[in-house]
């Protein structure tokens, strides 16, 4: 295909250029998603999370709930965001847990065996 190129103002450094030199991939391999306002009521979710029982485990930093919380519609919402089907929703032991970390604790960046991971931040006015 022959490249088409139009410069609205070729004599200056301003203006715009229309071109077919590059195009977007029609089927990108998305590996990262951001969803704002995930919960309808994040303050209530946070209050609920703060009332749960957390335990300390030497295997990771911070505190986590022992219980897993699978709230109605969350799996489907994540599937919609990713445009993928989640097949082992309840099988992975870290799924649906609340975690709490204190300010100043440096996170440990790592990779587990699952294909995807998600985090919902509930700290109000976080930096």
Per-range role (PLM):
Residues 1-127:
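Fe(II)/2-oxoglutarate oxygenase catalytic core
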């Amino acid at each position: 295909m022959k490249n088409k190129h139009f410069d609205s103002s070729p004599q200056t450094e301003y203006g715009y250029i229309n071109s077919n030199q590059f195009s977007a991939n029609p089927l990108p391999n998305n590996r990262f998603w951001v969803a704002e306002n995930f919960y309808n009521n994040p303050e209530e979710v946070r209050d609920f999370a703060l009332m749960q029982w957390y335990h300390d485990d030497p295997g990771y930093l911070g505190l986590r709930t022992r219980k897993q919380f699978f709230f109605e519609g969350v799996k489907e919402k994540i599937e919609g965001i990713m445009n993928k089907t989640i097949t082992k929703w309840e099988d992975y032991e870290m799924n649906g847990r609340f975690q709490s970390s204190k300010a100043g604790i440096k996170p440990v960046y790592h990779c587990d065996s699952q294909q995807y991971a998600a985090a919902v931040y509930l700290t109000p006015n976080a930096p």
